[in-house]
Amino acid sequence: MGLQARLLGLLALVIAGKCTYNPEPDQRWMLPPGWVSLGRVDPEEELSLTFALKQRNLERLSELVQAVSDPSSPQYGKYLTLEDVAELVQPSPLTLLTVQKWLSAAGARNCDSVTTQDFLTCWLSVRQAELLLPGAEFHRYVGGPTKTHVIRSPHPYQLPQALAPHVDFVGGLHRFPPSSPRQRPEPQQVGTVSLHLGVTPSVLRQRYNLTAKDVGSGTTNNSQACAQFLEQYFHNSDLTEFMRLFGGSFTHQASVAKVVGKQGRGRAGIEASLDVEYLMSAGANISTWVYSSPGRHEAQEPFLQWLLLLSNESSLPHVHTVSYGDDEDSLSSIYIQRVNTEFMKAAARGLTLLFASGDTGAGCWSVSGRHKFRPSFPASSPYVTTVGGTSFKNPFLITDEVVDYISGGGFSNVFPRPPYQEEAVAQFLKSSSHLPPSSYFNASGRAYPDVAALSDGYWVVSNMVPIPWVSGTSASTPVFGGILSLINEHRILNGRPPLGFLNPRLYQQHGTGLFDVTHGCHESCLNEEVEGQGFCSGPGWDPVTGWGTPNFPALLKTLLNP
């Protein structure tokens, strides 16, 4: 049977739509705290929905990622282009035609694809969208720290059963923007303000052995990026003031090279300021991009829009740092698996993706009356490098580091343990004398974080005001990312490719070039069984601080060749 005949038969089933299915049956609906409904959306109002189309050759993609990321492979560093990835994963002609005809019949207009052809973003009226997706009912909600407006459906949606081989999920229906990361209150026991200097670029550079010469050369095409999903703005004026106060001892750039997305004139957010200021002071004098979500349409998911950008740009920064995270159990399995595939695509192209491990320790939730730890995603993805958090042993001195009790870490309930970390994790499980009860975590899951950096007590400039005591793994992540950008600078100057997906190499080196953090535990369930304690750090890798924090000269020596 020819493609045309198969398509006609399939379209008849799709349009009839009598047999339907829910592509995300395990997607939990819960209105986040602080959000309220403003009621149904006008049926004639237009909204934007994103359709994730089924991809092909994912096993082959996984093999290629392993080959280009493993230093022992002859293919190491021979990354794929965006066009190579597109040729590999793009949906079948039948999938493309079926979905396009289905959307066209429903009245969808202005459908935009990406280079890899595996996402379609279309505009429809609310009336059309609710007919297209039976069960969906679009409401407007407002909430979050900046009183963001979003359009979402509190009810599950259905698709024609005939589309099951062709569509993974539809984005823009259920998931809310992530909440703002927590900040510690200023400690009350500090007696003399002058004693508390806090973490600044000079403190970080001293602790991690960066000299004034450890900056970008300004002669390469090296670049780095941070992505924002918290409806926040950053201001270049804040960056200028931050560097005036804290960047006098090293060469740095005075402004961001490129903003992808809309950058408005509202008040700056602390999170946005933190990411930009510390990425650009750790990765000093390196061209920096910012992915900004403010100004997007109410029905779009900022994180999903960022993934679409990665699938549509052939030339991207080498290092991306991201502070976004959700509980694994709050997301549908098909959504998690598809996002993980997007990370795989990035790894094949030689991009280094760093995600914050989260600020709730091991996490905690109750399942059928039993407490369990609660892993985070994307921190638990096997295709990203996850960054945990530490504190100074003495908060007033530049000393060895200990666990920051909020540092996220644990074991995925979705992804199995990847081969690259098998030895390290098995050794931890065998040797740790402080393991929680086995019922609290999935010992065979992907374990995280992979590395760490200081996450406690940062100075940030936001709205031209210096703010102390900003904390969280959203601070440690851009710091580690900036240091990797400096290593990429040396690799590029030496004719080497950028580091790409770091984890296979990181675990092969068993922590060489990193300060091992061996003291402290992070938080978890406040019950009698574990009494608020999650996992504890120890020699080598652990699920609190990973392999440890960067010692720049040693890490550069380790990662410079091949």
From Swiss-Prot:
Residues involved in Ca(2+) binding: D516, V517, G538, G540, D542
The enzyme's E.C. designation: 3.4.14.9
Highest taxon, organism lineage: Eukaryota
Cofactor descriptive note: Binds 1 Ca(2+) ion per subunit.
PTM summary: Activated by autocatalytic proteolytical processing upon acidification. N-glycosylation is required for processing and activity.
Keywords for the protein's UniProt record, in alphabetical order: Autocatalytic cleavage, Calcium, Disulfide bond, Glycoprotein, Hydrolase, Lysosome, Metal-binding, Protease, Serine protease, Signal, Zymogen
UniProt GO BP: bone resorption; epithelial cell differentiation; lysosomal protein catabolic process; lysosome organization; nervous system development; neuromuscular process controlling balance; peptide catabolic process; protein localization to chromosome, telomeric region
Enzyme class, broadest EC rank: hydrolase
GO CC, any one term: melanosome
Reaction catalyzed: Release of an N-terminal tripeptide from a polypeptide, but also has endopeptidase activity
GO molecular-function terms, A-Z: endopeptidase activity; lysophosphatidic acid binding; metal ion binding; peptidase activity; serine-type endopeptidase activity; serine-type peptidase activity; sulfatide binding; tripeptidyl-peptidase activity
Propeptide cleavage-removed residue intervals: 20-194
Subunit structure: Monomer. Interacts with CLN5. Interacts with CLN3.
Job description of the protein: Lysosomal serine protease with tripeptidyl-peptidase I activity. May act as a non-specific lysosomal peptidase which generates tripeptides from the breakdown products produced by lysosomal proteinases. Requires substrates with an unsubstituted N-terminus.
Listed name of the protein: Tripeptidyl-peptidase 1
Source species: Mus musculus (Mouse)
